[in-house]
Amino acid sequence: MEKKTVYNITNSIAISEEEAVNCNIPEVNKAEINLSQLKRNFDIIQGFLKPNTKFMAVLKGDAYGHGIRPIAKELINLKCDVFGVVRLIEAFTLRKAGIKTPIMLLAPISPSQAAWVIRYNIIPMVDSEEIVEALDQSASQNDTIVKLHVKINTGLNRYGVNPENAVKFIREIHEKYLHVQVDGVYTHFQDPDYNPDFTHKQIECFNNIIFQLQKQKLRPRIIHAANSTGIIRYPEAHYDMVRCGTLLFGLEHEQGQRNMPKGIKTLMELKGRIMKVRTIRAGEAGGYGSTFVAKKDSKVAIIAFGYGDGISRGWKEVLVAGKRVPVVNYFMDGLMVDISNIDETVKELDEAVIVGNQGDESITWLEACKSLGSYVDEQIQCITERVPKKYFYEK
């Protein structure tokens, strides 16, 4: 596959993005992020939606480790309607990047943060009168009206107003506060992949609240419930808007229970340079702690991708010269792999693939995370800042 690199983002501690674009920094490893695949994923997901259903791209956790600013800018080109984040700092990052798209906070704020929500034109989630009051007071001081979304707790039991109090809570906001407006109501599923019976109970509970709001002429403009799994498996829960995170980035669950739609793929591949090739004699140890002792004369390679870059101990295999090779030792700045069974000449600065394709072989995120007992969306966010991100379109 031919690639056209559009820009690089290198360690922000050492160098700015602008500098990274204009100079060729020697790199020993990288995360390659395929923006063409992002568009394909976006288009495939849109195919599940009815016309006029709004699309919220959930970009929490630095866009699931993919880089919140470049991903958001690409999604603007794709006509994404709303961005969802969890921390105020994520919303500030987008606004500071010049992004005007509506941004919604999917977790509660503290009263002291109300002024910042208004200053940066962010849509807050509320589930307590204390927050509504703080928003109303701050909005009054700024002579504006804040549009907010009320979260309903239908079973996840993290945030949200309990169902028996939801209609009363929303009605009182309408009656008591002049500078806030309930623009949306939403809920979040507890276990849509593995427990459809409970998910349907959540939908039924949520529908009952919507019905009561309609009867009292309190139905807000935007109703939403479906997350990534909900988009695929619960079309009755699409309502006015869907929230999409892991599916947009092609991140499967540990057992692949989601049944990913055809064509949805991950965007990110991880690659590292071979920094040293050497022979270890039979009986000698390689790396810290003598965890690897050669049973015979063995050729090993040191790859510049260690747990300081976000690779967990327990990573089983990588690709060298298009073949799978076992990882035999881990350290902060690299991996030691046994390349004794590779016939081809392997030399220093050759590229190894940690996750992705090389030749006819591939290692997927799902495969790697199963061996670690981890989740893909958990592991991919472990990749650290010192790994340069290279964004590209397929030619």
Swiss-Prot record:
It comes from the Bacteria. Its EC number is 5.1.1.1. GO terms for biological process: D-alanine biosynthetic process. Substrate binds at residues 158, 332. One of its GO terms (cellular component) is cytosol. One of its GO terms (molecular function) is alanine racemase activity. Its cofactor is pyridoxal 5'-phosphate. The modification N6-(pyridoxal phosphate)lysine is found at residue 60. It catalyses: L-alanine = D-alanine. Pfam families: Ala_racemase_C (PF00842), Ala_racemase_N (PF01168). The active site is at 60 (proton acceptor), 288 (proton acceptor). Keywords: Isomerase, Pyridoxal phosphate. It is an enzyme of class 5 (isomerase). PROSITE patterns: ALANINE_RACEMASE (PS00395). CDD domains: PLPDE_III_AR. Pathway: Amino-acid biosynthesis; D-alanine biosynthesis; D-alanine from L-alanine: step 1/1. Belongs to the alanine racemase family. Catalyzes the interconversion of L-alanine and D-alanine. May also act on other amino acids. This is Alanine racemase 2.
